[in-house]
Amino acid sequence: MERVEFKSHDGRLVPLTITRHKKTKTDGSANLLLYGYGSYGNSMSPSFSSTRLSLIDRDIIWATAHIRGGMEKGMKWWKEGKLTNKKNTFEDYIHAGKYLIENNYTSKGKIIGMGGSAGGLLMGAVVNQSPDLFLGIIMAVPFVDSLTTNLDHSLPLTVGEFDEFGNAKDNKKHFDYIYSYAPYNNCLLYTSDAADE
């Protein structure tokens, strides 16, 4: 296991934990699972997990991006990844993937992104933003219709989310910002026929 830091889009250094088998080559040939969360000030502390061993034994690298929105670097780190700074969370994660490619841990199209709940929001946003970076995405209970949820104050969790994501119903700035990244609102459906011209 190694801990490195990489530069994000704005020059901030972001921690990244990389776990791999000692026989796994760093020549760009390995598949890689990149985990991220980045919300509510929850830190993704490095820890042992026996469930990861099956992947690591198969030459799959496990990396955890300690992106803004968590509190790995304190309260300011959290604030730089919430409300109208939420896009820093997504940029940090995308730059983690780019760092792993540039440093030959993996290659473009060999990364599986993984996150759940608010980490599912992260997955939806980053796959919309940089689809070519990923082989696939694993979303566990994803929060992908974040704008519609935020607009419905009758839902039991919505009002409690205002401190993290903002209040889109009563604040146009928050509405516009959430709309700009909300996975559901930013999906495009492409269809084609066998001979589209």
Predicted stretch roles:
Residues 67-192:
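Active-site-proximal cap/loop segments of hydrolase catalytic domains
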Residues 1-109, 116:
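Cap/lid segment of the alpha/beta-hydrolase catalytic domain
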Residues 193-197:
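A short, hydrophobic C-terminal helix/tail in secreted or cell-surface proteins
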